[in-house]
Structure formats: C-alpha cells, structure tokens
C-alpha cells in the first residue's frame, strides 16, 4: 500500500510540475529571401518566417491551434516528427498530422487543435507540414523536449537546422517533377543549402566550454554532412534516443534525421578561427549544375580579431569518415528483438506508368490518396476494421496484431538513397547493407541484377546484440535494411520515404496496428469532424467513401495503368525529345519567315541531341 501511495505521489508531483504550452499560429504566405539570392513566398506563422522553435519539457502538454490563413486554395496539416502520440498514455492519433491518413486537410479559414502530452520522450524532434511538399517552402521548425535529467553536461545549447532550398514554389516544382516531360523521374535540383534558414553563418565559441549542438535535416531531398576542422564531436543523441558517446569529426544526416553532439571548444585561445563544413550529398543529384554550390563554410569564431577560417573544399574532406549509425548503441541498453512474429518484405522500385510519369513503388503498388482518411475508415467501420479490403488497394495497408514483433525488410531496386521514416514508433536496425554499384554507370534494365536483396539465411553481418534504435533510416543504393519493432502502440502509422519528392511519387505504406483496440481508445472529436466537413470529405466510410457496402470501392482513386508492354523509359524520352525537336523545327520555319532566327536555337538543338546521346538514343535531324 505504501508503494502505491509513493507511485501516485510521484505522478501527482509530475503533473503539478508539467506546463501547458498554448500556441496560436496562422499559416500564410510571407515574402522572404533565405539565401540572399532570390526572393520567394515562404510559409510563415503569424506573418513571420522562419517559424519558431518549440521548447517543452518531458511531461508538458501542448495545445497548438493551427489556422489556415492562406488566401488561395492551399490546404495544410501539421506533423510532429518522431513523437509517438501514444494512445495508451492518453494521446489521440488525430494529433499525428499526415493529411488523409490521420486527419482531413485544414482548408482556408479553418482551425485545428493539436492537443497532446509528451510524457515518455526527450530529445530532438521537429514539426512540419504533412501535405504535398509544403514544408520545403518553410513550414517547419524544431521541437525540442528537454530532459531535467540529461545524462551529459554542457555550457551552451544550439539548435541547428539544415535544409536544401528551392527558389520556386513547391507547387510549381512538384508539377514539373511529376510530369511526362520528366520520364526519368530526376528529382528537382535545389538552388542552395541553408544553415539555420540562412547562409554565411558565424558561430561564437569560448575556450574551455562545451556546446550541445542539435542538428536536424529538415530539407525535402538531399542528405547533408557536417564536418569539423580540428575539433571533435561526441554523438550523444539520435532521433530522440540517447546513445553511448561516439567520437567523430563528421556526421551524415538524411532528410528527417536528427543528431545531437557535444563539441568541446579549444582549452586555450587559439591563433585563428576554424571551419565547420556543411556539404550536400552529391551522389543524390542526377546532375550538378555549374552554378550550384554544394557546400558552405560556417565560421567557428573564437575571436573577432583572429584570422577567419579558410573556406574548405569538398576535396579537403573525407566523406567516408562520417559515422555509420548501424554501429551506434543506445545508452539505455535494449536487447535485440530476437525473433519476429510477422515479416513485411518491401521491394522499392521506380517505374513509369501509362501517363508517362515515373512513380515510386512498394511491391508494385504506388500510394494513392484515398477519398477518406484511413483513420476515419478504421474508427467508423466497427468489426470490419481488421479487414484490409476496406482500406483500398492503393495505400499498401499492413495490418499488425497488438504486441507482435514486426520485421520490415526493405530491398532497394533503385540506384538512389532513400531515408525511411515510421510514425508512432522507433525501430531497431538489425541489418544495414552498404550501397552497391554507387559509382557505376549501368542501364536501368540491369537494376535487378545490381541489387543485393536481404538473404535471411545468410545475412551480410551478425545481428547486433543491442541494435541502434531510431525513427528514420537510410536505405542505401541497390542494398537492403532490416528493421524490427514491437507493435505496442495501436494506430494508423504512416511509413514513407522522407525524400519528399519520392513521397509525392507514392513511396509510402500505412501500418494499421491493433485496429479493434484503437476503436476502444479513441473516437473522432468534433474538431476533426468539422474540418472534414469543411473540406467536403465524408466522416464515415471505406477508402472510397462508401458505408452502405463497406466492400464497394467504386470511385476509389487508383494508380494509372502500366505502360504498354515493351515501352521503356528510353522510348518515352525519345518520343518526347523527338516531338520537341519537331516542334522546334516548325517554329524555326515560322520564325524564319517573319524575322530573325532565335540566337539560341542551335544551342537548344545541340542540348537536346546531347540528352539523346547520353541515353543512347538515335534521332535524325530531319
């Protein structure tokens, strides 16, 4: 009896100390110039950009009111990346944020309340729009959960966001990307990289003091390196998980990943300042335009009068030294989940469909948004919630039993890197292959031969006794990764590539975990129902919006039909470029009859010919 009295007194004290953070934000377009080179519309809160970082403590409550203040037809939603929204601790899945997965989009004029507690997590997280590629236009910020009992000491704390930056609006870039005129699926090349939403940054250091740097890659696409000149970092936290200190001078962060490091300043005043390098992962870019700056130098300044650090070149840096997260170990020892109850094998592919667009696939299925949020379908379907048919055949629904150990195997039949993020859980990384054939040039038709899929009977490396735990992991080119987690958080959890261009291509799945138990814990609240009605989205029904017959999927959005047999990406490219050349020819004839020949005509022609030659396609000038 005394024990229970003690427990309840501790809980009561925790509740008494917890704070409630009431935040009111209106999202709208604001004009900004993050890189100093190009003014554009960014997404601000309350008329300001960058968005504020949110700092809370473990056990605090957040009440964030998000109002859609866009004056156009832009809808939005907000996700708190890495937060479990654990329903067993009183939170609601309706607070997770991905549009048409766990909520309806917030249309202009509507307000949605994100109301949750953060009782069991600490560390570095972030919040961002989860609709289209919106957060690339700045709708993002750090979300830091401070721990009164941090297992390390430091004198100063700095939150550092890394991101790629596009000069064009995300809607324009997405439209050009998902187009038959981009049949190779080449990802949009950013125009710059940002360090804390800007460039040309100087960081002040005091001799003898220790700094906690919380690095977050909040970009849409490109992974980034951070490299220190003549300084060392001690990695102490990854994706909200404390790790045993690991010393390095270089780290690697994909989109969505976070890493906290301790940096010890020089003991005595040095004779010069030093460099911190921020470098794009060039291997993720199909082409590198000559005007693209792949890196920038951040000054680590000890004194205003000291000589500045020289700008380092990428050639000066050994990128292979970046820490491999597979070999990190959680500070709180967690043994390997030694077996699995349910295995999900997902083959990642990029394929053109009949509309000429290149889509991303898990097991030959590309994610297509349903007419009703998946959470709505689950919570209004009664006993049918455990039947995968009601969720449609284009969201890659995976039904998981409560407390089962789940193994997810990802095989990469693509030549690019993919950072995968799971909502609602961390996972153990039990196998992670290197990339294969990264520097080789080979035809797309040879990809299956180049890929090294996971062989359960002959894993490439021993299973770690205490695997690294995080929520976002990089799948290497032509390689594989194996993840395990316990399905102990009932919900509708999005699993997707955090290269947002790949998410727009459909590289996503939905893990529907313990649906009957979730029905017992959660009901759709009035605010949820109101924003759905405002968006003209049904508040009951299957993926197609039908509730009279739950297995009637008539009208469900589906992926386009496949290309005709034998019609390749190269063939499509030849058709498009030949058409362009033909149109160019007709245009030139018309121009010749009415005025001077356009000076750049010959340049356009030769550029198109070069593209054809690179793809080994022959087209006569005609």
Curated annotation (Swiss-Prot):
Q: Which residues lie on this side of the membrane: Cytoplasmic?
A: 595-622
Instruction: List the Gene3D superfamilies.
Output: Cupredoxins - blue copper proteins (2.60.40.420)
Q: Chief location of this protein?
A: membrane
- Record-annotated membrane-spanning stretches: 574-594
Which Gene Ontology molecular-function terms are recorded?
copper ion binding; ferroxidase activity
What does this protein need as cofactor? Cu cation
Per UniProt, Cu cation 3 binds at 130, 423, 496
Gene Ontology CC terms, in alphabetical order: endoplasmic reticulum; fungal-type vacuole membrane; high-affinity iron exporter complex; membrane raft; plasma membrane
Task: Provide the protein's localization.
Answer: Cell membrane
Top-rank EC class of the record's enzyme: oxidoreductase
**Residue runs in coiled coils:** none
Q: Which GO terms describe its biological process?
A: cellular response to iron ion starvation; intracellular iron ion homeostasis; iron ion transmembrane transport; iron ion transport; reductive iron assimilation
Q: Which domain of life is it from?
A: Eukaryota
Q: Per the UniProt record, which EC number(s) apply here?
A: 1.-.-.-
Q: What UniProt keywords apply to this chain's record, in alphabetical order?
A: Cell membrane, Copper, Glycoprotein, Ion transport, Iron, Iron transport, Membrane, Metal-binding, Oxidoreductase, Repeat, Signal, Transmembrane, Transmembrane helix, Transport
Q: Which CDD domains match?
A: CuRO_1_Fet3p, CuRO_2_Fet3p_like, CuRO_3_Fet3p
In the record's cofactor note, how is the cofactor described as bound? Binds 4 Cu cations per monomer.
Sequence ranges assigned to domain Plastocyanin-like in this UniProt record: 43-146, 192-301, 392-514
Looking up Pfam families in the UniProt record yields: Cu-oxidase (PF00394), Cu-oxidase_2 (PF07731), Cu-oxidase_3 (PF07732)
- Any further remarks? Present with 2840 molecules/cell in log phase SD medium.
Any idea what job this protein has? Iron transport multicopper oxidase, which is required for Fe(2+) high affinity uptake. May be required to oxidize Fe(2+) and release it from the transporter. Essential component of copper-dependent iron transport.
- Spell out the family assignment given in the record's similarity comment: Belongs to the multicopper oxidase family.
| Quaternary state and interactors | Interacts with FTH1.
The entry's protein name is Iron transport multicopper oxidase FET5
Q: Which organism is it from?
A: Saccharomyces cerevisiae (strain ATCC 204508 / S288c)
């Amino acid at each position: 009896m005394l024990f229970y009295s003690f427990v309840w007194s501790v809980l009561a004290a925790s509740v008494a100390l917890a704070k409630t953070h009431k935040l009111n934000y209106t999202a709208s377009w604001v004009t900004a110039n993050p890189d100093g080179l190009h003014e554009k519309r960014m997404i601000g809160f309350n008329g300001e950009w960058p968005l504020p970082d949110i700092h809370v403590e473990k056990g605090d409550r957040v009440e964030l009111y998000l109002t859609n203040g866009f004056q156009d037809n832009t809808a939005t939603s907000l996700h708190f990346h890495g937060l479990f929204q654990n329903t067993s601790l009183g939170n609601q899945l309706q607070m997770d944020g991905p549009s048409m997965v766990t909520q309806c989009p917030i249309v202009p004029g509507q307000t949605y309340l994100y109301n949750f507690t953060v009782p069991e997590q600490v560390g570095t997280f972030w919040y961002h729009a989860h609709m289209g590629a919106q957060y690339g236009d700045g709708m993002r910020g750090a979300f830091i959960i401070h721990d009164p009992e941090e297992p390390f000491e430091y004198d100063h704390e700095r939150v550092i966001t890394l991101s790629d930056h596009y000069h064009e609006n995300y809607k324009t870039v997405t439209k050009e990307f998902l187009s038959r005129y981009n049949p190779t699926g080449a990802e949009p090349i950013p125009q710059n990289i940002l360090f804390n939403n800007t460039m040309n940054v100087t960081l002040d250091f005091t001799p003898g003091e220790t700094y906690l740097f919380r690095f977050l890659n909040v970009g849409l696409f490109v992974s980034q390196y951070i490299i220190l000149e003549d300084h060392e970092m001690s990695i102490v936290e990854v994706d909200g998980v404390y790790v045993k200190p690991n010393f390095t001078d270089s780290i690697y962060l994909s989109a969505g990943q976070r890493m906290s490091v301790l940096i010890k300043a020089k003991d005595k005043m040095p004779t010069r300042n030093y460099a911190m390098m921020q470098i794009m992962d060039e291997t993720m870019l199909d082409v590198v335009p000559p005007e693209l700056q792949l890196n920038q130098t951040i000054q680590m300044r000890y004194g205003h009068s000291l000589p500045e650090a020289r700008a380092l070149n990428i050639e000066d840096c050994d990128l292979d030294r970046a820490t491999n997260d597979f070999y990190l170990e959680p500070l709180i020892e967690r043994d390997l989940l030694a077996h699995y109850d349910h295995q999900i094998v997902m083959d990642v592919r990029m394929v053109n469909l009949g509309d000429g667009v290149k889509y991303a696939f898990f097991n030959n299925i590309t994610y297509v948004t349903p007419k009703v949020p998946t959470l709505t379908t689950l919570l209004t379907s009664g006993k049918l919630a455990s039947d995968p048919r009601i969720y449609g055949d284009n969201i890659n629904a995976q039904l998981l039993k409560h407390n089962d150990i789940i193994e997810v195997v990802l095989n990469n039949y693509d030549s690019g890197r993919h950072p995968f993020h799971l909502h609602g859980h961390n996972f153990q990384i039990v196998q992670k292959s290197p990339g294969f054939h990264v520097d080789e040039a080979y035809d797309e038709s040879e990809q299956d031969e180049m890929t090294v899929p996971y062989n359960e009977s002959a894993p490439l490396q021993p299973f770690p006794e205490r695997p690294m735990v995080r929520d976002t992991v990089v799948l290497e080119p032509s390689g594989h990764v194996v993840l395990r987690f316990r399905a102990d958080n009932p919900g509708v959890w999005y699993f997707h590539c955090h290269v947002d261009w790949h998410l727009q291509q459909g590289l996503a799945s939905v893990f529907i975990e313990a649906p009957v138990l979730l029905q017992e814990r959660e009901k759709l609240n009035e605010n949820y129902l109101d924003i759905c009605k405002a968006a003209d989205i049904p508040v009951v029904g299957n993926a197609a919006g039908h509730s009279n017959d739950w297995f009637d999927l008539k009208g469900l959005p589906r992926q386009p039909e496949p290309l005709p047999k034998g019609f390749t990406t190269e063939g499509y490219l030849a058709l498009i470029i030949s058409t362009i050349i033909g149109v160019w020819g007709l245009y030139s004839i018309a121009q010749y009859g009415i005025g001077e020949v356009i000076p750049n005509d010959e340049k356009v022609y030769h550029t198109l010919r070069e593209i054809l030659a690179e793809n080994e396609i022959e087209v006569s000038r005609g």
